[in-house]
Regions:
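Alpha-helical transmembrane segments of multi-pass membrane proteins
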Residues: 1-284
């Protein structure tokens, strides 16, 4: 078993986990509400903790000579479940209602979004179990990958947005699977599958960056039907919605709207603002 490849693979896994966790804080704030951003932290803790218990239970059935294959399988599962969780998040928008349907959607989001962290945790836990004699080196690569993921997030988020970061994470996780698979003899199938998955995810990132086919269509219970401009930054998603004849609005995370109009004197948007201000002054 090639230990350097295992170490590099773990670095890619932890890099991917931190990028995913932090990008989910932005995605949850845009698709749901800002206080749900902190749910990403609990998801990471829940998934990682569950993976530790799982590996502890099944580790005796995992033959040491097949460690590379199991690590590669965990990395591929991380990549695939990540795409699945993104689909669930985007197709189950929360609303202002408090009925059972809304709670069911939230449960689906929580369960699906925890899966990538579970499989990533399985890879890290299994590597620590099998390479306990070199835990200092493994932990070094673990922390280095996590730190690099945090540093890369802001420039990459500004460049391609939170949704494409989630897709990019799948490519990086699958690339870790390539390293894991090639670290052990007899893991050619796992290596090839991981490589194909990494390339496919990379192509999907490039395609979606130019077409925006995978994007937020409904947020906070409202359809986004007239988006003129959309851009992610390190702390929010900015959209411009409406039409230039009646006026447009700039929104932060599908909320906090600010109206813009060509004709400020006759704008219905500004009239609403003046009416609201007049009502406020009468109350006070």
């Amino acid at each position: 078993m090639s230990r350097p490849k295992i170490f590099l693979g773990i670095s890619l896994i932890t890099l991917s986990v931190l990028m995913l966790e932090l990008s989910l804080t932005r995605l949850f704030s845009a698709t749901m509400y800002y206080h749900f951003a902190f749910m990403a932290i609990s998801l990471a803790l829940f998934g990682s903790g569950a993976s530790g218990v799982f590996i502890y239970i099944v580790q005796r059935g995992l033959k040491p000579e097949h460690t590379g294959q199991w690590l590669s399988l965990a990395a591929m599962s991380f990549a695939l479940s990540n795409v699945f969780s993104l689909y669930v998040i985007l197709s189950n928008p929360l609303t202002f209602e408090t009925g059972p349907e809304n709670y069911y959607r939230l449960a689906k989001i929580y369960g699906a979004a925890a899966l990538p962290f579970f499989f990533a945790g399985c890879a890290v836990t299994l590597a620590i179990t099998r390479l306990a004699s070199e835990i200092s080196k493994l932990y070094l690569f673990d922390l280095a990958g996590a730190a690099l993921g945090c540093l890369l997030l802001i420039p990459v988020l500004n460049l391609i947005g939170a949704i494409n970061i989630v897709l990019l994470v799948s490519s990086l996780a699958a690339l870790a699977g390539v390293l894991f698979g090639s670290s052990t003899a007899g893991s050619r199938a796992a290596t090839i599958c991981s490589l194909l998955l990494a390339l496919g995810s990379a192509v999907l990132v490039a395609y979606n960056s130019s077409t925006h086919r995978i994007d937020i269509r409904k947020s906070k219970g409202f359809e986004e039907t007239s988006v003129l401009f959309s851009k992610w930054n390190s702390f929010s998603r900015i959209t411009v919605e409406g039409d230039f004849d009646s006026g447009v609005e700039i929104k932060i995370d599908a909320d906090a709207a600010t109206g813009i109009s060509k004709d400020a004197s006759n704008s219905a948007i500004h009239q609403d603002a003046r009416d609201s201000l007049s009502g406020l002054l009468r109350i006070t």
